[in-house]
């Protein structure tokens, strides 16, 4: 006796829910399988989390270069510091601006590099 898949489906459709549940249990026992839906394994939490784009930047003066006077003038213009403070910052290097937008950080970097300084934006 050969049953087609269609005849099997029709026979199952005629059964009540309780009878179908008993059939499923019998199939699980007979073949050693489980009818439970497989659990989805997600990737690592870091991979699932969206990457946040940096919105605040820090502009740091690394080196004044050969045109120290031009760099001091640029530092004064950018920071609003007095002559002595701008000179000290230019000679020692350090943070010029903190928590600024990307556009402002790029503008400051461009001005100082035009004066001959080495600048880093983080």
From Swiss-Prot:
Keywords: Ribonucleoprotein, Ribosomal protein. The keyword Ribosomal protein applies. GO terms for biological process: translation. It comes from the Bacteria. It holds the Pfam family Ribosomal_L12_N. One of its GO terms (cellular component) is cytosolic large ribosomal subunit. NCBIfam families: L12. Homodimer. Part of the ribosomal stalk of the 50S ribosomal subunit. Forms a multimeric L10(L12)X complex, where L10 forms an elongated spine to which 2 to 4 L12 dimers bind in a sequential fashion. Binds GTP-bound translation factors. This is Large ribosomal subunit protein bL12. It comes from Xylella fastidiosa (strain Temecula1 / ATCC 700964).
């Amino acid at each position: 006796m050969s049953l087609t898949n269609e005849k099997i489906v029709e026979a199952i459709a005629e059964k009540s829910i309780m009878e179908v549940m008993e059939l499923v249990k019998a199939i699980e026992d007979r073949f050693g399988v489980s009818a439970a839906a497989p659990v989805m394994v997600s990737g690592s939490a870091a991979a699932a989390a969206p990457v946040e784009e940096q919105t605040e930047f820090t502009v740091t003066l690394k080196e004044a270069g050969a045109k120290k006077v031009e760099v001091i003038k640029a530092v004064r213009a950018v920071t609003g510091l007095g002559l002595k403070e701008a000179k000290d910052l230019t000679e020692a290097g350090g943070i010029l601006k903190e928590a600024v937008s990307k556009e402002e950080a790029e503008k400051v970097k461009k001005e100082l590099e035009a004066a001959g300084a080495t600048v880093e934006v983080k």
